A protein has these predicted regions:
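Catalytic histidine-centered segment of alpha/beta-hydrolase-like enzymes
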Residues: 21-24, 126-137
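Conserved alpha/beta-hydrolase fold motif
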Residues: 42-43, 67
Length: 158
């Protein structure tokens, strides 16, 4: 993705089957990638990847510095269990959604942001915030990510 070209040392979590969404399988791949990196990581995730990242985060919380969660999918739409997803994340996070996302209502994205203890930003009519909705390069998203990193660094200073 464009984000990968803008952020050095970025690694994409490859899924065995991008067309088959299985939360436990996808979360396992996120955990494997975090383990392979070795250092603490920042997460940028989109759609179902947000759910996988949040699920993985609870088992690797000490290894995650923060997360930008863009257009999170609604787990109910995929028949996924939500019990684990209903806890606050122990690191800074921002959920970005759209008022006309076909995969999740803005109210559901805001609900999940609240459950996760994430800041929430609705960027208006932006669809699923992907290439299909007219987003290729997304400088505003990169700026949001860099601000999240900066605010996190300020918050952890003594």
């Amino acid at each position: 993705s464009w984000f990968e070209t803008q952020l050095p040392a970025t690694r994409r979590v490859e899924q065995a089957d991008w067309e088959r969404t299985c939360l436990s399988d996808w979360a396992a791949r996120v955990r494997e990638e975090i383990d392979a990196i070795g250092d603490a990581v920042w997460i940028v995730a989109h759609s179902f990847g947000c759910l996988a990242s949040v699920t993985a985060a609870f088992e690797r919380a000490d290894r995650i510095l923060g997360a930008l969660l863009v257009a999170p999918a609604d787990p109910h739409r995929f028949g996924e269990p939500t019990a684990l997803l209903e806890e606050a994340l122990p690191f800074p996070s921002l959920v970005v959604s759209s008022s006309n996302d076909p995969w999740v209502k803005a109210s559901a994205a805001e609900y999940w942001a609240g459950q996760w203890g994430s800041d929430y930003l609705n960027i208006g009519d932006a669809g699923h915030i992907n290439v299909d909705s007219g987003h290729g390069p997304w400088p505003a998203g990169l700026l949001l990510f860099k601000r999240l990193q900066s605010f996190s660094a300020l918050a952890t200073r003594d």
